[in-house]
């Protein structure tokens, strides 16, 4: 696995034992730490699947444009994956979206 490829980091997140929940239930309870994904969200997995499926089924190809209406982490995941595949991404977001998220989506 090429660890320098951002796409290989998606979904490669650790399990973390939830100590209190484990003690309360008498079972080992683990949570998947999705915030370790490049976009810090489980939505990175969805974005990777959507784009790879579209490429596989010849719905989009290198140089193509994706248009997404989003107010959240799906757009961030799509931005990361689209850039890695050489695709253009146009995101439509509400005017009320935070400045930080707008800046992050422009990367």
Label the model's feature ranges.
Residues 1-107:
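PLP-dependent amino-acid enzyme catalytic core
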């Amino acid at each position: 696995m090429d660890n320098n490829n951002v796409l290989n980091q998606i979904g490669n997140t650790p399990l973390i034992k939830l100590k209190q929940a484990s003690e309360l239930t008498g079972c080992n309870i683990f949570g998947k730490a999705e915030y370790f994904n490049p976009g810090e969200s489980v939505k990175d997995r969805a974005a990777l699947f959507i784009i790879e499926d579209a490429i596989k089924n010849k719905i989009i190809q290198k140089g193509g444009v994706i248009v997404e209406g989003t107010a959240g982490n799906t757009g961030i995941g799509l931005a990361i994956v689209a850039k890695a595949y050489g695709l253009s991404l146009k995101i439509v977001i509400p005017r009320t979206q935070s400045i930080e998220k707008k800046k992050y989506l422009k990367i």
